[in-house]
């Protein structure tokens, strides 16, 4: 059974991370487990920027976005001697267990520590929803709400001015943010890695929607990294249709903001489950959702799992047909 637990957040921040941290701290205290907070991800493990959670009122962050303990990408952690330093720091403080909240890169780090004898649990924290071992990642719902709110505002002004807007959203190769926000906003064009469109195809959609069907606007939602320069795509559409077209990059706004209720609830349940897993002496596993249940998957399996590109393509095709009809 765990006696001292440390928590870190790693990689890109996501709304809801603070809620997971809060419930890990409070659940641990109920079971008499001492909790420590690692600041700035794996880098903090190596530099020993670790504080006792008793010094912090975690309840004050229940409605705050981001992660109050900070996060970082730390490529140095791939080196064995660097990881050994991290393990040494944990041992010196008597910490035997670690909960890592982050994406697949964070999971990889947790697995490496597990192999060095540290009990580790991974929680899925990323707005991209790109961890195939879970149906839902901490941050997805709030990021979707942020995208939808921005697209709704864009629709107002695009309708007023008879314009086209191409909105780039995050995803890290996964299409969930584009697909789901496209469904929620009625975007006439949705482009993901699994469902790509040429510029000529988008031009034909714009002509059909705004000239043949006399719609006042077209919204396209595009996953990041599909096109080298979305502004050039927008200009080509404008040049070939005569309809003013703008590229909108939402960028890091998607990662910020107060976590929505659904986010807080799911993150909290995962935090509780993380402590319960450690109480059962589990290690080297990633927790996630399947339906309404929290499941446990060995981290190597979680890293190998892949979402179906075919399913995504079929879903986006259906949504595009509905939104263009």
Swiss-Prot record:
Pfam family example for this protein? PFK
Where is ADP annotated to bind? 22-26, 155, 186-188, 213, 215-217
- State the needed cofactors, names only: Mg(2+)
BP terms from Gene Ontology: canonical glycolysis; fructose 1,6-bisphosphate metabolic process; fructose 6-phosphate metabolic process
Q: What class of enzyme is it?
A: transferase
Compartments, as annotated in UniProt: Cytoplasm
What Gene3D superfamilies does UniProt report for this protein, alphabetically? 3.40.50.450, Phosphofructokinase domain
Give residues annotated as binding Mg(2+).
104
**Keywords in UniProt for this one?**
Allosteric enzyme, ATP-binding, Cytoplasm, Glycolysis, Kinase, Magnesium, Metal-binding, Nucleotide-binding, Transferase
User: Which branch of life, at top level?
Assistant: Bacteria
Q: Which SUPFAM superfamilies match?
A: Phosphofructokinase
Activity control mechanisms: Allosterically activated by ADP and other diphosphonucleosides, and allosterically inhibited by phosphoenolpyruvate.
Has keyword Glycoprotein? no
For the keyword Magnesium, the answer is yes
What's its EC?
A: 2.7.1.11
One of the entry's Gene Ontology molecular-function terms is: ATP binding
Summarize where substrate binds, as residue positions: 126-128, 170-172, 224, 246, 252-255
Q: Which residues bind ATP?
A: 12, 73-74, 103-106
An annotated GO cellular component of this protein is:
6-phosphofructokinase complex
Q: Check the record and name the InterPro entries matching this protein.
A: ATP_PFK (IPR022953), ATP_PFK_prok-type (IPR012003), PFKA_ATP_prok (IPR012828), Phosphofructokinase_CS (IPR015912), Phosphofructokinase_dom (IPR000023), PKF_sf (IPR035966)
Enzyme active site: 128
Family under the similarity heading: Belongs to the phosphofructokinase type A (PFKA) family. ATP-dependent PFK group I subfamily. Prokaryotic clade 'B1' sub-subfamily.
Query: What function does this protein fulfil?
Result: Catalyzes the phosphorylation of D-fructose 6-phosphate to fructose 1,6-bisphosphate by ATP, the first committing step of glycolysis.
Q: How is the quaternary structure described?
A: Homotetramer.
Protein name per its UniProtKB record: ATP-dependent 6-phosphofructokinase
Q: Which organism is it from?
A: Mycoplasma mobile (strain ATCC 43663 / 163K / NCTC 11711) (Mesomycoplasma mobile)
């Amino acid at each position: 059974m765990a006696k001292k637990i440390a928590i870190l957040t790693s990689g890109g921040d996501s709304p809801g991370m603070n809620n997971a941290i809060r419930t890990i701290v409070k659940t641990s205290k109920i079971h008499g487990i001492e909790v420590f907070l690692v600041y700035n991800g794996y880098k903090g493990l190596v530099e020993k920027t670790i504080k006792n959670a008793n010094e912090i009122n975690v309840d004050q962050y229940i409605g705050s976005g981001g992660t109050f303990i900070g996060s970082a990408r730390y490529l140095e952690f791939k080196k064995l001697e660097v990881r050994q330093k991290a393990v040494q720091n944990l041992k010196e403080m008597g910490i035997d267990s670690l909960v890592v909240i982050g994406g697949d890169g964070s999971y990889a780090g947790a697995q490496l520590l597990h192999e060095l004898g540290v009990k580790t649990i991974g929680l899925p924290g990323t707005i991209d929803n790109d961890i195939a071992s879970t149906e839902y990642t901490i941050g997805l719902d709030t990021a979707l709400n942020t995208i939808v709110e921005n697209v709704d505002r864009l629709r107002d002004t695009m309708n007023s001015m008879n314009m086209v807007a191409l909105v780039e959203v995050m995803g890290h190769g996964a299409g969930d943010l584009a697909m789901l926000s496209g469904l929620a906003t009625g975007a006439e064009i949705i482009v993901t890695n699994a469902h790509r469109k040429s510029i000529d195809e988008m031009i034909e959609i714009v002509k059909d929607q705004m000239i043949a069907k006399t719609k006042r606007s077209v919204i396209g939602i595009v996953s990041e990294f599909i096109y080298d320069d979305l502004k050039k795509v927008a200009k080509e559409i404008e040049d070939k249709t005569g309809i003013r077209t703008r590229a909108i990059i939402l960028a890091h706004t998607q990662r910020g903001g107060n976590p929505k209720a659904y986010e807080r609830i799911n993150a909290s349940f995962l935090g509780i489950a993380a402590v319960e897993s450690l109480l059962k002496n589990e290690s080297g596993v990633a927790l996630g959702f399947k339906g309404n249940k929290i499941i446990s998957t060995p981290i190597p399996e979680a890293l190998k799992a892949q979402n179906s590109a075919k399913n995504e393509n079929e879903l986006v095709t259906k949504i595009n047909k509905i939104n263009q009809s």
